[in-house]
Amino acid sequence: MSAPAILAEDLVKTFGDVEALKGVSFEAQTGTVLGLLGPNGAGKTTALRILTTLLRPDRGRAEVLGVDVTEDPVGTRMSIGLAGQNAAVDENLSGRENLRLVGRLTHLPSAEIKHRSDALLEQFDLTRAEHRLVRTYSGGMRRRIDLAAALVHRPPVLFLDEPTTGLDPRSRTDLWGTIENLVADGTTVLLTTQHLEEADRLADRIVVIDHGEVIAEGTATELKGRLGSTVIEVGFGDAAGVARATEQLARLGAISTDGHQFRLSVTDGAAAMLETVRALDAAHLEPLTLALREPTLDDVFLSLTGHAAEVPTPSEDDDEALTASRRGRRSGTGGVST
């Protein structure tokens, strides 16, 4: 197998008394999508910031395209693109002006800047808004121009930190299609997300991080397969019902709870469902809902972290990362496109 396009090996990073990363390791092969999953504060953004030269690790190794990012940060920045939760383009410039600015900062010839700007504005359906100030753009348009800016210099590696946070379903689906097209053309993508459907659709491999440690990794199919072939989902009107049902059904399989609902992972769905109904009836418990279905990444996330995925919101870490990126671009010290 060829060398990975992205490599993190035993990364350690502390902030005061907080251990953000505790020996995190993962890799992404060329032309694939690696999804980093985890709750807020798990360490996903910290790992991404190290790989994109915005933070130095306390220990460990981080490489992009075989280059140690701490030894050659400027070269690394010229070979990657970065788009975060919040669009980092200049709101007081037009869409086209933002793309031209990134082109100049990454030292592209004038003709190439125009060619790339034309192509990206068309690709992201922004030609009709190219001369409007970005501050007049909708949330979906801002996310698209931000991603376009990250692609001006044709980076072979793209880092996306919660790229669809705050987007409506249609805009999210459109952006997924764009990412899929980039990967089909050979781009390597590292994607952090809490949208489990997003990881299920896009990621070739998934790494789950919690409390600064890798707690699971594999394909979506492999991760879901660890739970068993079927999930029985039971809902009650209160937490007391969940607690009583858990006592009755723990013998049937692995149980995870979430508020007024619990999920039972089993290998023989039909037999386990029959046993579930009998046990609930014997305990005089009447659930509001009872369903039998295939496991999802949400079940995996709940089983591994102890709670369901949160609604993604922009984090302070991400704001700091993008601010640092802007400083680098405007001072001419780097070419991270955000």
How does the language model describe each region?
Residues 20, 198, 241, 272, ...:
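Short phosphate-engaging motifs
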